[in-house]
């Protein structure tokens, strides 16, 4: 028999890995870990750049645009060959959808109203009818009808993802050009959002296509959008009350799929009313050898368009900044500055030119007959040379909690951030999103101009 004293070192050796493993686990359990999104939420996040790109029809291929034009034409003809009075129930909604594809907006409104006002005891597609009606009134530019339809929808149907998407479009339409109407709609929706946040029961199962429960983080972001518009309207006290009510209504425990986007929404909202933070600038694309800078004489207003290098529609929008600057600063006394902030790694330093190879003889070229290689596609920075674009670090996207692009950041004459919101590709059109934001800022927070001020339009450079 082996003496016991000889087995003790072996026992200690065998138990040592177990002890070390226990120690490491104890250390790991005491160290807070960074919360991670669920696999589905991580997948959705990874797909978001593709969704942003595909959502802009201007990014579609010629073949897709031709197919869309054919579909719209056929739907328009099919819509005109029928009348709303021919249909009821689900067939009436199908007809409304057909006419919406054909962009026959007056008929869409008539058909949707026919379904809404019908005496049928069951209207399973009532939310769809309201969605078609409100969307059509946006296309016919009828703000009173948009507000009335949205308020009616809130009272008539459950607040699902379809209702949420419909009201998002209505509020986006109303928020700047018809701010009182937008505030009325926000105020009517807010109790519904707060009640949904306070509900502890599991969400109801999805209903019809497009009608799923609204996630907690979306409810919170929508509620905070109300506070943002209250701030933009010059009522910070009301905004603070709105935020306090939202925070009180939030559940005590949140999953990472909700807590992570809610934290991002909070960070972005917290920027409103604060001075523009320092933004590290890498390169200016406006002119060669120009030192990158942001004019701290903010004029009547300064706006930035922040986006990553993969955003194709953002690049197209940026190429329209110079004509927009000349239009806005064209003699009415306004002084507005616009910049694009291209978030990407710093451009590499150009390598010294190599000694060119000796040209091949005419005889060898004719024998090989090598095809000319196509030029590589231009980078975002190459496409934006000569525009008021500043290259900034990728961390700038995190700094402004930017998830949709381009993110428009507008500041007042004192450098205070007043507006943060994703912008569409038609934002720079005359009278559109940017013009409305600047008009509101110059009215709400006017710049104190010297009596003998020289008109900025006399300057040959509208940027600096």
Q: Which positions does each model-derived feature cover?
A:
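Short active-site neighborhood of thiol/selenol oxidoreductases, capturing the structured segment around
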Residues: 290-321, 338-341
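N-terminal leader/linker segments that initiate helical-solenoid repeat arrays
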Residues: 26-90
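A short beta-strand-turn-helix
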Residues: 280-302, 326-330
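Alpha-helical repeat scaffolds
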Residues: 68-79, 106-117, 143-157, 182-201, ...
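Thiol/disulfide oxidoreductase modules built on the thioredoxin-like
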Residues: 382-386, 391-437
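Structural microenvironment flanking redox-active thiols in thiol-disulfide oxidoreductases
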Residues: 315-382, 391-397
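Short solvent-exposed coil/turn linkers within tandem alpha-helical repeat scaffolds
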Residues: 78-91, 102, 116-128, 156-167, ...
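N-proximal helix/coil linker or "cap" segments that precede and/or mark the start of modular domains
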Residues: 229-284, 295-298, 368-371, 449-456, ...
């Amino acid at each position: 028999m082996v003496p016991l004293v000889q087995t003790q070192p072996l026992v200690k050796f065998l138990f040592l890995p177990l002890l070390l493993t226990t120690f490491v686990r104890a250390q790991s359990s005491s160290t807070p870990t960074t919360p991670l999104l669920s696999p589905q939420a991580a997948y959705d996040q990874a797909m978001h750049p593709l969704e942003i790109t595909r959502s802009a029809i201007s990014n579609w291929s010629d073949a897709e645009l031709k197919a869309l034009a054919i579909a719209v034409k056929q739907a328009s003809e099919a819509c005109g060959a029928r009348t709303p009075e021919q249909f009821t129930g689900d067939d009436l909604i199908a007809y409304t959808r057909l006419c919406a594809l054909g962009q026959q907006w007056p008929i869409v409104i008539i058909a949707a109203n026919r379904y809404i006002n019908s005496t049928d005891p069951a209207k399973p597609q009532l939310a769809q009818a309201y969605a078609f009606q409100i969307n059509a009134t946006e296309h016919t530019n009828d703000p009173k009808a948009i507000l009335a339809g949205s308020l009616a929808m809130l009272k008539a149907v459950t607040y699902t993802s379809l209702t949420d998407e419909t009201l998002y479009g209505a509020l986006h339409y109303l928020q700047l050009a018809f701010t009182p109407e937008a505030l009325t709609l926000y105020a009517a929706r807010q109790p519904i959002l707060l009640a949904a946040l306070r509900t502890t029961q599991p969400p109801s199962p999805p209903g019809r296509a497009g009608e799923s429960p609204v996630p907690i983080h979306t409810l919170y972001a929508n509620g905070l959008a109300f506070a943002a518009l209250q701030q933009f309207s010059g009522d910070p006290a009301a905004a603070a009350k709105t935020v306090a009510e939202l925070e009180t209504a939030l559940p005590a425990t949140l999953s990472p799929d909700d807590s992570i986007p809610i934290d991002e929404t909070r960070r972005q909202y917290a920027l409103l009313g604060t001075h523009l933070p320092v933004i590290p600038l890498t390169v200016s694309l406006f002119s060669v050898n120009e030192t990158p800078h942001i004019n701290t004489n903010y004029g009547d207003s300064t706006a930035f368009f922040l986006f990553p290098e993969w955003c194709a529609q953002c690049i197209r929008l940026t190429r329209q900044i110079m004509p927009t600057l000349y239009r806005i600063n064209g003699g009415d006394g306004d002084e507005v500055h616009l910049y694009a902030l291209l978030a990407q790694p710093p451009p590499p330093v150009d390598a010294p030119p190599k000694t060119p190879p000796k040209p091949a003889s005419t005889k060898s070229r004719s024998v090989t007959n090598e095809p000319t290689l196509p030029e590589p596609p231009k980078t975002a920075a190459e496409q934006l040379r000569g525009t008021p674009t500043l290259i900034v670090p990728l961390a700038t996207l995190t700094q402004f909690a930017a998830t949709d692009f381009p993110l428009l950041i507008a500041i007042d004459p004192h450098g205070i951030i007043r507006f943060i919101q994703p912008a569409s590709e038609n934002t720079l059109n005359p009278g559109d999103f940017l013009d409305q934001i600047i008009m509101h800022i110059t009215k709400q927070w006017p710049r104190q101009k010297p009596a003998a001020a020289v008109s900025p339009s006399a300057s040959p450079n509208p940027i600096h």
